[in-house]
A protein has these predicted regions:
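Conserved structural-core and active-site-/substrate-pathway-adjacent residues in large, well-folded domains
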Residues: 1, 30, 70, 95-96, ...
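Glycine-rich beta-alpha loop elements in corrinoid/cobalamin-binding modules
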Residues: 1-50, 286-324
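N-terminal [4Fe-4S]-dependent radical SAM core
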Residues: 33, 39-89
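N-terminal pre-triad scaffold of radical SAM enzymes
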Residues: 76-104, 128, 169, 192, ...
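Short glycine-enriched, charge-decorated loop/helix-capping segments at active-site entrances
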Residues: 107, 207-212, 291-297
Length: 324
């Protein structure tokens, strides 16, 4: 809002783009790249960053302290054509308690700040009534870690259920999955469940600080399958630091263990399970413990993809990967 107000004032005063940039640079937390000169050593490393006169020597990171009082847009532009994310989005909290070593957002958006359930219900209803959307997503880095999730779900269901509005939880944790909560939330439309184990073996999950065990993953799937779910999405990464071929094959082994769990808990069915498996190409991110880790080559990534493909034979598994 401060930048928008500054822009409005600049337009009203007839300021040039450069004059506007000088004004907006006075706002705490705003960085204008063109106001800084970078010099380098002969080996290509950074020697110095020199600000122009009037620009702050160091831009201070600015953090929204209170999410309940922060601006949240409930009146959004509704496209005239169908779009991919054709739904309302509600940010329930910012930050993450987990600390996965590959996750840039988990480190950059600290500390954790949550909104109240009452305030979220109000924002959700305003957004849905203004947009006319038939689905709303409770967005965050780890939605199931929100402490007031059940109270929020109850409040939203009172509004959404009679209007046939779907309530979506995009980021679930295998170690705190609640079948009762999911049964209540998905009364309108039972969609698939999505989990991100990220690595195929416990050794590698521990190395990346993905604090979820194979037992928790299988137990969660058993709970979901016994509740009537027959579709699950699994996300992994290839090329994580210290990853070996054993870890890659471990992804396929975990998939087959999930298939066996479905056979034991899916109402005795032999068919009907859908496992959507996806692998991403790991890219080391700045400000994470893995920022200096080596990235595998595209050729090595595809070799690991083909290794995984060679170990996937079940017809119920749809495997997709990044080709570039």
């Amino acid at each position: 809002p401060e930048i928008i107000e500054c822009y409005r004032a600049a337009k009203k005063q007839g300021l040039t783009k450069l004059e506007f940039l000088h004004e907006v640079a006075k706002i705490e937390g705003v960085y204008v790249p063109s106001f800084y000169t970078h010099t380098y050593h002969e080996d290509g490393t950074l020697a110095a960053i020199t600000p122009e006169p009037g620009a702050p020597e160091r831009v201070k990171k600015r953090i929204v302290q209170d999410m309940n009082t922060a601006y949240f847009p409930t009146k959004t532009i509704v496209p005239s054509t169908q779009i991919v994310h054709d739904r309302s989005n509600l940010e329930i909290f910012r930050g993450c308690i987990r600390g996965c070593r590959f996750c840039q957002a988990g480190f950059c958006y600290r500390p954790i700040r949550a909104k109240s359930a009452d305030g979220l219900c109000k924002q959700a209803i305003e957004s849905l009534e203004d947009s006319g959307n038939s689905e709303i997503t409770l967005a965050s880095l780890s939605t199931s870690d929100y402490r007031e999730l059940e109270a929020l779900a109850d409040g939203l269901l009172d509004y959404c259920e009679p209007r046939k509005i779907n309530l979506s939880l995009p980021s679930l944790r295998a170690d705190n999955f609640s079948r009762e909560l999911m049964m209540r939330i998905q009364k309108v439309r039972k969609s698939g469940l999505t989990f991100a184990p990220e690595a195929g073996t416990q050794r590698l999950r521990d190395a990346i600080n993905k604090n979820v065990t194979e037992e928790e993953i299988l137990s969660t799937c058993a709970t979901a399958f016994s509740g009537g779910w027959n579709s699950v999405k699994l996300y992994f990464m290839l090329g994580l630091p210290t990853e070996t071929d054993e870890d890659v094959v471990g992804i396929a082994e975990l998939v087959y263990k999930i298939l066996q769990v479905w056979r034991e808990n899916g109402s005795g069915k032999k068919r009907g399970l859908s496992i959507n498996l996806a692998t991403a190409y790991f890219v080391p991110k700045p400000f994470t413990p893995f920022q200096w880790a080596a990235q595998i080559t595209p050729e090595e990534y595809l070799r690991r993809v083909h290794l995984l493909q060679a170990n996937l034979h079940a017809k119920c598994v749809d495997y997709r990967y990044h080709e570039s």
